[in-house]
Amino acid sequence: MATGLSALLLCLGFCFGRGGFPFIHQSTAAPMVSYYDYIIVGGGTAGCPLAATLSQTYSVLVLERGGSPFRNPNITHLSRFGAALSDLSPKSPSQRFVSEDGVINARARVLGGGTSLNAGFYTRAGSPYIAKAGWDAKLVNESYRWVEKVVAFQPPLRQWQSAVRNSLLEIGIRPYNGYTLDHLYGTKVGGTIFDGYGRRHTSAHLLRYANPSGITVFLHAPVQKILFTTEGKPRPTADGVIFTDASGLNHWAYLRRGPNSEVIVCSGALGSPQLLMLSGLGPKRHLQAHNISVVLDQPLVGQGMSDNPMNAVFVPSPRPVEVSLIQVVGITHNGSYIEGASGENFGTDQTQSTRDFGMFSPKIGQFSTLPPKQRTQKALDRAIQAMRFLPRSAFVGGFILEKIMGPLSRGHLQLRTKNPNDNPAVTFNYFKDRGDLERCVQGIKMIEKVIESRSFSRFRYNYLPISSLLNMTANAPVNMLPKHANASRSLEQFCRDTVMTIWHYHGGCHVGKVVDRDYKVIGVDALRVIDGSTFDYSPGTNPQATVKLSSITSRRIKGHPGNGFPNDQRKKDDTVLALLAVVTEEILVIVKGSIVGVECPIIGLKMKMT
């Protein structure tokens, strides 16, 4: 009896570790050689719903370089936000990288991608964008409602977030749009992918809609390169991939012969251009310098990298405040978005014996606001050590932050090594374009007004003027690392000194330059890129969750009993299912439409799976 119970518990633990999905396996279980209709590289925010949809009719392989998000409290629980980002271990779901600008950043290394790490903000695309895309508004709204039953929730608006809302209205960011998932100028309360119990719902949860017999997901399976063939082909054609399992053994996955079989890269703004280069698609000289055989000289791979700058001001509070991520946003007409996050110890679980400081941790780099070039590991270690001796009361308060739309400044990405697990070298050139700096200054001025407003007076010390708050933020995480004494007098200096990321980096495989309007890689066949690397800039469909990666579609499903979603009201005629993952580090929006394709509302990119 005891043996049977132990076996049952072991089985249940294993199954729930996979989210209850029988098709998720460790890479060590993969056959040495296998064949599929579609091979999706990256089981992130874009890859998961794409795979779930395609699996209704085709055989799909998903290769995820990271592990499972299920049963990981640092991912699941809102109260632990920041812990995963602070985890710098090799098995962490977050992989830290530092741009050549010196800004600390992170990329997902887990099934579900950025939705397993982000602050969870959820939004719909605006109705003007839907109209411009040419979608059937009724079907789109019907689909939004369906999705929102699964991943979108109304956050509880407590005292600190209520004060932020009232302050935004007091300083004139109007009208008040209440709780809405739409993108509207003014002040609003948005949705969240955290439910009422503070549990995260990621894009990996959308695998529940997959056809179990049509999909295979391997974890800890980084792809080394895409394989190409030219035999009997007018130009290079993707034929499969080589991936490595957790024990270091190589496996070969090939496309089945057929007109529709494809390799689809969904590895994100860093991973996708990196993988193209490692596979021989990129600037010829750069590839040759790394002894990579050139399949196609494509000088624009890795170009046009952008990251939306974020700047924040920490406001210590004389009274306890709730733990909250982004809930209230002020959408302005000048190109900046005002938001806030709060909480004692900022997400650090109070039951933990050790203190990793959650969102406050210098390991994250978000609020380690030394100028980028001074954010050395030695400085961060010194800050962490100093913070350990501070009382918990020192961490009570919140951040008012601003993020600029766009941005206009651009950089580039290059390989460091031939190892796909290593971070490439990326430069974003923050504030290189004067327009970005001007937007930042305007945003900081609005933050000052919010902090000085009557509505926010209960949550700030009256004896601390704005100049002191700016200097506190500019000088240190929790006042420990000194810097420019004049930061409060020069907002331009403050913007430059305290620039951070909000994880909305994008570019590297732009539409019209690296991929065509159908997201097919130009110059080769049977290969697409579908993620934020295709974006020229982040569309402002949401005040804080600007689109970083998009776009997921499925094929027209002929003669298939349904369109891939349980209990959905399908049409009798031929159904087209279009899944649009309008996602950044902080959004998940899925749209079902009657048009074959998806479109980025701002850029006007449409993709058709033909």
Residue map of PLM features:
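A conserved FAD-binding loop/helix module that cradles the flavin
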Residues: 539-553
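Redox-cofactor-proximal catalytic regions of oxidoreductases
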Residues: 80-170, 212, 404-421, 425
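Short FAD-binding loop at a beta-strand-to-alpha-helix junction that anchors the flavin cofactor
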Residues: 524-536
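Mid-to-C-terminal "cap/lid" subdomains and adjacent gly/pro-rich loops that border
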Residues: 214, 273-277, 281-406, 417, ...
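N-terminal glycine-rich phosphate/pyrophosphate-binding loop and immediately adjacent elements
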Residues: 11-132, 138, 243, 293-300, ...
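Conserved redox-cofactor binding core of oxidoreductases
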Residues: 116, 129, 134-238, 244, ...
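FAD-binding beta-loop-beta segment adjacent to the flavin cofactor pocket
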Residues: 405-413, 509-527
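Glycine-rich loop(s) and the adjacent beta-strand/alpha-helix scaffold that form part
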Residues: 60, 66-71, 136, 226-235, ...
